[in-house]
Amino acid sequence: NMVQFKSMVQCTSTRPWLDYVDYGCNCDIGGTGTPLDELDRCCQTHANCYTEARKFPECAPYYKTYSYTCSGGTITCNADNDECAASVCNCDRTAALCFAGAPYNQNNFDVDLETRCQ
């Protein structure tokens, strides 16, 4: 779920969570358009991963709770998660690690979606 995703991002990155919420074209719920950079591409991939997770019965990625641990920037999704939870956890894990490895461009924060996101 989104609270757990926030915690994962905070575990892997030194940036405040809110720096990612309105970044680029794809880092907000319902984001769309060609990614502006690597970090925005992380968000697009995360959104696409959630779309795949929704294929499991009654799987709602934004709300699904899962079990995981995070220590020293290493995230482990627990093996006892059901299919939906495992899928969502892996989506969030992959995105959090992607965020941590991608450069942050302040010019891509709070962009004008109509002019910059086609």
Curated annotation (Swiss-Prot):
Tissue: Expressed by the venom gland.
GO molecular function: calcium ion binding; calcium-dependent phospholipase A2 activity; phospholipid binding; signaling receptor binding
InterPro entries in the cross-refs: PLipase_A2, PLipase_A2_Asp_AS, PLipase_A2_dom, PLipase_A2_dom_sf, PLipase_A2_His_AS
Top-rank taxon: Eukaryota
Name of the molecule in the record: Acidic phospholipase A2 homolog
GO biological process, alphabetically ordered: arachidonate secretion; fatty acid biosynthetic process; lipid catabolic process; phospholipid metabolic process; positive regulation of fibroblast proliferation
SMART domains the record matches: PA2c
This protein's UniProt keywords: Disulfide bond, Secreted
Organism of this sequence: Bungarus fasciatus
Residues annotated as transmembrane: none
A Pfam family reported for this protein in Swiss-Prot or TrEMBL: Phospholip_A2_1
Family listed: Belongs to the phospholipase A2 family. Group I subfamily. A49 sub-subfamily.
Annotated compartments: Secreted
Disulfide bond sites: C11-C70, C25-C117, C27-C43, C42-C98, C49-C91, C59-C84, C77-C89
